[in-house]
Every structure is written in structure tokens, then in C-alpha cells.
Amino acid sequence: MGRSKSFGVIVLTILLLVTAAVNAAEKPFVEIDIYSVNDFHGHLRAEAADPGMAALAGAVSELMKQNPEGALLVGAGDMFSGTIDANEYQGQPVVIAMNKMGFAANAAGNHIFDYPLEIIKKQAAAAEFPLLGANILTAAGDKVAEPFRPYTMLQKQGLTIGIIGLTTLETRDKASQTNLQKVKILPPEEVAQSYIDELRNKGAQIIVLLTHIGSSQGEKTAVEGEIIPLLQKIQGVDAVITGHSHLCVSGEYNKIPIVQAGCYGEAVGRIHLLYSRADKRVVAAGARVYKLDQLPKVQDAAMEKLLAPIFKDIDARYNAVLALNDQLLTNDRNGESRVGDYFMDLLKSGFKADAALYNGGAVRADLPAGTVTMRDLIKIFPFDSTIYVGEVQGSDLRQVLEHGIGNPNISRLRFAGLQVTADTGEPEGQRISRILLADGSVLADEKYYKVVSNDFMFSGGDGFASLKNAQNLRACGKANTFFAFALRSFKTINYPAADDRLQIKN
């Protein structure tokens, strides 16, 4: 009698599963919701304006309950690095947290190459989702570089969804040049259409571009940015997820929904697709961004428990006080940065250089008033570059300033030891009208100057190609090691609110 009852339960279960599958297949319309996070940059813990991963996980979980059978979650790149919590463990805490949230895929961003390829392979091995980068090839250019995959295919509501991963061509300039040596970044348009066609031939009914490619949008304007020229050259895409520009975008191009969800876990993107089985295509679509501060706050307790030991370990090692700061020093990546000025002054004096230079994108946070800890320092300089000293000709130094000041494509150059007058309304090559050294002398194009900077800049990163001409380069250790030593030595920071190192006419 017991066996008969068990057999009956098994048969009933099978019938229910079959019936559910049939019902799903018979639905004339299917709703698919693709939720996305981009440019998280390792902001795992809640502090200041950052919601933290527990809040992000809670918000995503609640949103996905609206369509549990038809929802999926993806990442649009630059997830694994950018804070001490992530960097100290080579991105693994973010990977583990994303596993717990159930990410279905993650596109490779330019900052994936903050890590060497060997570390990226370890991240991919730990991830329960594929790391996508269809335009990231081996150095020989013969195939997609491991551990990246060009696309993934998955099933939702009886539909086959193909997701293609693409990264910005700006990765060539906005990533560690050393770590890029083993790969070749192709223009996305050179590979996108072939993979779209391949997925269609394999039966994909919905195709999504999961990209770390920039987009932007005014309050009432169409979507713009790097993603649009790509979309003008391809066809057959149903949805586009973007990243890289750290903006909230929800719009469309040629009726293709496009989304981007800010940065640091502040928001979640959503693309809603309505698929018609009769028409065998997406017949309606929309894009939306949910800001976490506008949603009911739901903390994921399991995520908090998962991350607590990591935070405890980091705090124990990096909360020691380095110095006391008299006043807040702010950082505007596209404008003035007294933080950048202060640390460039430390570099110039510490290495007895004529000038100190730093790419503005490497300076990421304010320096708070009061106690300054190693955690604070790493928030400012999360990528911990290597310091280099070299001899740079005046004409090349002038070109660095022309490229780094008033350039809308990169964060403003940080420097010390120079007094510069610039007209940012002029094109590159005509912006700088005066450059004085600390002794009041005018920069001489033919003369060589002692310059201290970082490995990223001396290797031509961010387009600072003229620095590749530097002579007698020598490595001088990690930047954060030097900065921490300097702060401990001075013990107090009393830095003026402004100076005249940069005078802008326009």
C-alpha cells in the first residue's frame, strides 16, 4: 500500500510539471524582465551614499518577485574592483555575493583588467555565471581570450534568450596597460553582428546585448553616447544594457530599449519585454531605472551574514589612524580636487621632482576631516598604482597638460610643481597658454624635467601617449605605501582651501 501511494505521488508530480510546461508553452504572450547592475566597483558595505550589497540584494529580490518565472539578473561590468573590501581579496567577495544573488551573466568592463589575466581566470572559476566579452581576444587575435565567453544562452518561460557580452573600446586606454598585454580589444561592431546571427541560428528568440559601453541621456532627450554608433551598424537585437559612464539611463533607440543603472549599487535597471508566440518576436518593450533610495529598504540578512567576516577582517587591519586632517578636502573628478592637489604635492616633494602628474580617474574620493585611516586612503586611491620617476621633455610635458585639462573624455589631470593657464574652450593643442615651474621659469620644450607619476600614465593610459617617450624610468614602489608613510610622518594635515596652480580662462 505504501509503495502504491508513493508511486501515485510521483505520477501526480510528473503530471503537474508537464501541465505547467504545456501551459507555459500555450501562453500567447510571455513577459520577460531583465534586471541589471553595472559599475558596482566593489562597494559591498553600506556607507555614505552607498547602499551596500545587502540592500542591493534585498531590493533585487523584491523586484524579481513581480515576475519570478520570467525574471533574470545580469551585471554590465566593472563589478569586482574599486574598494579595499574587494581589492584585498582580488574581487572574490563580489563574485561570491553575485553568486548568492543569482546573477545569470556579467559583462567584462575595462576595470576587469585592474587584475592580471591569471586573477581574472580565478574570478571566472569561482563565478556561477559566465564572464562575457565577445570583443576581448587573445593577443594573437585568433579567438576570444579565456576565461571570457562571447555569449550565453538560457531558458525563461519556454523561451531561449541569447546574451552577448561586449566591452568598450576605451578599455585600450582606460585599463592597466601591463594587464592588457595578453589580450586584444576589438571594436564591438566588428564582432557583434556575427554573434547575433549565430545565436539566431541556434534558436535564440530574444537577443540581449550586455555591454560595458557608455550611454547618456538628458532629462527629456534621446539616448546618446558610445552605444549608439554600435546600434547603427547592427540589427536583430531586442534589448541593450549599458555601463561605463556611471549614469542612469532608461530610453530607447529605434524601439530597442536601453538601460544603465548609475554606479556603486545605487540603482537597478529593468528592461521589460513582451514576446508574442504567434508573431515569434518581441512586440513591446520598455526600460526603467529603480533608485534604491526610492524603494522600500529591505536588507538581505543572509548577505549581511556572508559579508560580515570580510568587513571585520578589513577593519581590524586598516582602521589604524594615519593622520589628523583639519578640514575636508574634496574631489571633483571633472573639476577641482584639493585631494589630488595635496597628494601631488606630497609626490613632488617626496621624490624631489620638477613635476608630479596623476590621471584624474585614479583619484576617487574626498579626504574627510578628522582622523584619516588606511581605509580612507584606499577609497581615494583604490587602484594602488606603482610610482615611477623619469625624465620627460618639456614638449611632451606640455602635451600631457593639453590632453589632461579640458578633455571631456577623461577626468581632469592632477599635477604639482607647475602653474598652468588654460582655456578649456579651445581644442587640444591650443588650450595651454602658459606653464611656469615652481621657480618661476617658463617651461622649455627642449629641456628634460624630472617627473614623478604612475605606471598607468607612463604606459600611455587615458591617451597620455607623450609620456611613453620618457627616459630613465625607474619604479619606486606602490603609491599607497608612499602616501601612508607620508601621512604618518606629517601626522597632521593643514592644507589651504585653494591655490593658483591652475587658472582657467573659459
Q: What positions do the PLM features span?
A:
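Acidic, metal/ion-coordinating pockets
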Residues: 24-312, 334-349, 356, 371, ...
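Bacterial N-terminal signal peptides
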Residues: 10-19
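Flexible, polar/acidic helix-loop-strand segments at domain edges
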Residues: 365-392, 396-404
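A hydrophobic, small-residue-rich beta->alpha segment in the mid-to-C-terminal subdomain
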Residues: 443-489
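Glycine-rich phosphate/diphosphate-binding loops and the adjacent beta-loop-alpha structural elements
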Residues: 317-336
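Charge-dense polyanion-binding interfaces
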Residues: 409-437
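Bacterial N-terminal signal peptides that target proteins for export
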Residues: 1-11
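A glycine-rich phosphate-binding loop feature that marks nucleotide/adenosyl-phosphate handling sites
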Residues: 288-291, 324-329, 357-367, 415-426, ...
